[in-house]
Amino acid sequence: MARISSVATVSAHASRRLAQRNLTSDDVQYVYAHGRLHHTGKALFIYLGLRDIPDEHRREDRYRRLEGTVLVLDPATGCHLTTAYRNRQRGSRDIRRKLKRSIL
C-alpha cells in the first residue's frame, strides 16, 4: 500500500545520518511509500522489512539493500524526517517495544 504524501523536509541530523548510511532521497521516498507505519511515543516510525518490498523489486540490489531501514518522522506532520537508521536483525520489534508515552 503506497502513501500519497512524501517526506518534505529533512533535519540537519537526518541529512548527516543519510549520508553516513549511503541513503539517497529516492531511497527515503521508497521506504516512505512501502514501509510499515508505527506510532510510538513522540515519533512516527516507518520500517521497511523484506515482506514490504514488492515481489518484482526483491531481486534488485538497490531495493534489497533498503531492508531494515527505519525512518523517524515528526508525528504532527509526518513529513519532517528527524533521523534514519538500519536494523535488519530485530526489525520492527524494537519499535513496538518503545515507550507509549514520554517520561517527564
Residues covered by each model-derived region:
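Ribonuclease/tRNase effector modules and their secretory precursors
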Residues: M1-L104
